[in-house]
């Protein structure tokens, strides 16, 4: 089975690398956990985690997981269609559309997801926990909830012009 992902150039960004230890009888076992976001900058983005004894191997595993976990982001011009508020664990993320030219007003993990998704104009606010994995999961969940005006109109059984 052929994958289209190979033809599309995906950009990857390492959001977090954690050193994790497992205490065993002989001492501590060190491993590294990596959180990576990948995207094509054109409406597709995904995230993944990987764990290994070496950092590069953990990053490679995370990139592979992220490529299998891609989502489509509906966009209106250079921004998102509507405001969305999501939470995952203790992390809460608010994403708001912004006028063209205002840029990406987002911090840390939210910025990584938004930029790799290809959204050029957006305002966001992270509330609650600032744990990178939960922030990324909340952001991706918010992007999954976005719907275009045509989709909303079809769900309601009305025309797009009646929507406003």
From Swiss-Prot:
HAMAP family in the record: Ribosomal_uS5_B
Please name the source species: Streptococcus pyogenes serotype M1
Q: Which GO terms describe its molecular function?
A: rRNA binding; structural constituent of ribosome
Would you identify the family this protein belongs to, as annotated? Belongs to the universal ribosomal protein uS5 family.
The residue ranges of the S5 DRBM domain are: 10-73
Q: Which InterPro entries match?
A: Ribosomal_Su5_D2-typ_SF, Ribosomal_uS5, Ribosomal_uS5_bac-type, Ribosomal_uS5_C, Ribosomal_uS5_N, Ribosomal_uS5_N_CS, Ribsml_uS5_D2-typ_fold_subgr
How does this polypeptide assemble, per the annotation? Part of the 30S ribosomal subunit. Contacts proteins S4 and S8.
NCBIfam families with a match to the protein in the record: rpsE_bact (TIGR01021)
Record's keyword annotation contains RNA-binding: yes
Which PROSITE patterns does this one have? Answer: RIBOSOMAL_S5 (PS00585), S5_DSRBD (PS50881)
Q: Name one GO cellular component term.
A: small ribosomal subunit
Name assigned to this protein: Small ribosomal subunit protein uS5
Q: Which Gene3D superfamilies match?
A: 3.30.160.20, 3.30.230.10
Q: What does this protein do?
A: With S4 and S12 plays an important role in translational accuracy.
Q: Which UniProt keywords apply?
A: Ribonucleoprotein, Ribosomal protein, RNA-binding, rRNA-binding
* Superkingdom of origin organism: Bacteria
Q: Which PANTHER family match?
A: MITOCHONDRIAL RIBOSOMAL PROTEIN S5
